[in-house]
């Protein structure tokens, strides 16, 4: 017996990816096969994982932010959604005609939004930083311009936002199989940080985690191995940083390192390697040796 079935498959965007006819040859007698072991399927509600962070802001006033060069869909929609959620008061800095063109194309409501018209991305970065320096906004958001373009204005000695502490970047990673958000630093600003730079990078990340509701962040200082090796600088830095934390030179967090990536985020891996640590397998913050390795992790 032959069965003919029309067959059509669409992808997540509703586009047809398979179209044809399936011919099935029906067996003439009953066939039994052993049950196959199926992989475990986990459904992760990504928005749910961030609700506790948003919940912390419910009684706070929205803060003014400058959005530098929001000239594509994502960088324009994001601050408008944050405005609608009562989180921010966006100030859009960029070519007004281009911003309005994107808004009209994508149905983004700009009513009541302040737009500062500047000719190009470099002027957007310069103006956004000036607004922050003058206290007109409390935060900066990068739009559709290169990170270097914005950061060159931020770190300018004359007109930037320098403080006594070194600037650093933190990724907030959504890992479905990890029980809480994971902060990764620094994978965007400091290319090859020194030991002194790493002190600032760690302190910045600890204070951010505390602001996010983590009372004593667990900080894993990553390297290729979990033992100190004089030929691997990152292991020496990790050991020194942990001792500096013991001496109060880094405050507010619980540090351990060097730790390889697997035993920083997996209790099973840490136990297998015989690592006894309050940080291993349950880190809140991953401190990477340099920008390259940080980008690979994040």
Show where each model-derived region lies:
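Anion-binding alpha/beta catalytic cores of soluble intermediary-metabolism enzymes, centered on
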Residues: 43-91, 95-298
């Amino acid at each position: 017996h032959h069965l003919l079935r029309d067959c059509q498959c669409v992808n997540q965007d509703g586009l047809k990816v398979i179209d044809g006819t399936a011919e099935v040859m029906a067996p003439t007698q009953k066939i039994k096969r052993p049950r196959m072991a199926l992989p475990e399927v986990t459904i992760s509600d990504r928005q749910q994982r961030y609700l506790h962070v948003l919940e912390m802001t419910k009684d706070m006033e929205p803060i003014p932010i400058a959005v530098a060069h929001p000239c594509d869909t994502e960088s324009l929609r994001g601050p408008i959604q944050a405005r609608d959620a009562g989180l921010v008061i966006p100030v859009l800095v960029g070519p007004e005609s281009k911003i309005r063109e994107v808004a009209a194309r994508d149905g983004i409501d700009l009513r009541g939004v302040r737009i500062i018209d500047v000719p190009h991305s470099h002027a957007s970065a310069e103006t956004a930083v000036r607004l922050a320096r003058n206290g007109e906004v409390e935060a900066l958001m990068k739009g559709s311009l290169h990170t270097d373009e914005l950061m060159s204005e931020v770190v300018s000695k004359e007109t930037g936002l320098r403080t006594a502490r070194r600037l650093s970047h933190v990724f907030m990673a959504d890992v479905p199989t990890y029980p809480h958000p994971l902060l990764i630093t620094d994978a965007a600003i400091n290319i090859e940080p020194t030991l002194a730079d790493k002190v600032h990078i760690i302190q910045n990340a600890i204070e951010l985690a505390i602001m996010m509701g983590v009372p004593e962040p667990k900080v894993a200082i990553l390297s290729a191995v979990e033992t100190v090796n004089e030929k691997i600088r990152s292991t020496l830095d990790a050991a020194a940083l942990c001792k500096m934390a013991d001496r109060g030179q880094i405050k507010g967090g619980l540090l351990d390192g060097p730790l390889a990536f697997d035993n920083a985020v997996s209790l099973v891996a840490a136990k297998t390697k015989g690592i006894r640590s309050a940080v291993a397998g349950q880190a809140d913050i991953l401190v990477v040796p340099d920008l390259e390795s940080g980008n690979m992790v994040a």
